[in-house]
Amino acid sequence: AYGAQGGYYNIMNNYYKLGPASAKDKTHARFFTAYIDDGKNAQDAGVFGYFYVNGNIMDNTCVDLSGEQQKEIASANANNISSTAFKVKNDERTSSDLLLDMRIDILSDYSFMQSATDAYETVLAYAGAWTCGWKDNEYIIPERDKIDRRIVSETANGTYSTNASKGGGYGLIDSQVDTIEKWDEYITATS
């Protein structure tokens, strides 16, 4: 991720799952790149954000990663604010100017947290569109639709089944048309 010219940010307990395209990218071990405002937004030049960065994990299971990339990811996981993991886009400020020692307090109603690994497992277990309900007086056991089953499987296994129609690769797409499949028919009823 990048940006955040102004404001306060907790970047905590996120799980970053690298795909095959990530191994070709120089940001394979980067959690965030902070930008300093250049004055083109609705604020003065030089405005920057403040960040608390901790508990994030960059998955290193992509088979296309080199040994050096594996080391850089291990460094980012061990220290989320290392120069590999957190960058500042220009030379006006150093990362230590932007980083906070304590997380930014938020309303307690919004502060439920899981570890990055637990959050990843929760998403794999529960995310997506689920079919359920009644059909012909029989209850349908909830299950993901086929598209979300494919997406969860590809995420868990680090694989892909689609490519860009205009020449891209490694699972990156140019348009939603590149991923069109026949959608499941969902049961509708009035309540």
Language-model-detected regions and their locations in the chain:
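An acidic, charge-biased composition feature
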Residues: 1-2
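A short beta-loop-beta micro-motif enriched in histidine and acidic residues
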Residues: 5
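Long, contiguous C-terminal flanking segments immediately downstream of a protein's structured core
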Residues: 16-190
